């Protein structure tokens, strides 16, 4: 798949994964249109990081969409009455940081935007290996959403579908960190922590997964 001179809408959260997708697209000489969401999350640090990443890669356009999912809560990321888990990643259990329907809503908005500007791809930073078990970050979800997208818009019906591009889907976090360095991603400007403190907490699932992967990458890199 070639991205050169193609238009791509990237869901840019400001975290490691979406920033890496943006870096890959930039290195591939794609025309990048970034979308972030102010969805009633606990803090705005990730939006600040997304803006910094958008400027760093000098993308074509960057939009922040206001869409308040905190109106009904249901997750510790949108409801401050719920505690963010800090006990470590638990297998076979979806944590309360999962925001109901978030990716489905975000990708649907991206699909509308992509069709409006005649973009060829939607870039997503989802990955199914080192993650918290969210149902909307899995390969079967992406496959089914692609099928839905092909039916839901004009381009799909005309056999010129907008494709979901998920270059990180089958990678672990260590591999993603390597890709980030290879594609000029300023890791110190990205934000992955679920908390909105001045520094990452180091205890939430997102911090634990990222920090463990970085240590592995660092150790392997030092052995070379």
Q: Where do the model's predicted regions map?
A:
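ATP-dependent adenylation/nucleotidyltransferase module used to activate substrates
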Residues: 1-183
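Iron-sulfur (Fe-S) cluster-binding segments and ferredoxin-like electron-carrier domains
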Residues: 196-224
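Low-complexity, intrinsically disordered or weakly predicted helical/coil tracts enriched
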Residues: 167, 191, 209-213
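Immediate flanking context of iron-sulfur cluster ligation sites
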Residues: 182-202
């Amino acid at each position: 798949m070639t991205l050169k001179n193609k238009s791509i809408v990237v869901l840019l959260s400001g975290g490691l994964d979406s920033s890496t997708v943006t870096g890959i697209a930039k290195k591939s000489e794609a025309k990048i249109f970034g979308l972030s969401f102010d969805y009633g999350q606990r803090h705005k640090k990730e939006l600040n990081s997304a803006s910094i990443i958008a400027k760093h890669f000098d993308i074509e356009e960057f939009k922040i969409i206001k869409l308040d999912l905190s109106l009904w809560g249901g997750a510790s990321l949108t409801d401050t009455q719920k505690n963010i888990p800090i006990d470590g990643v638990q297998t076979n259990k979806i944590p309360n940081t999962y925001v109901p329907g978030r990716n489905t809503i975000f990708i649907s908005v991206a699909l509308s935007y992509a069709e409006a500007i005649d973009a060829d791809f939607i870039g997503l930073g989802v990955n199914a290996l080192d993650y918290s078990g969210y149902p909307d970050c899995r390969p079967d979800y992406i496959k089914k959403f692609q099928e839905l997208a092909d039916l839901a818009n004009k381009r799909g019906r005309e056999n010129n579908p907008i494709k979901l591009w998920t270059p990180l889907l089958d990678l672990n976090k260590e591999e993603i960190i390597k890709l980030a360095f290879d594609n000029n991603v300023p890791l110190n400007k990205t934000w992955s922590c679920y908390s909105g403190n001045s520094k990452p907490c180091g205890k939430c699932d997102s911090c634990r997964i990222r920090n463990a992967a970085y240590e592995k990458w660092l150790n392997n890199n030092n052995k070379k």
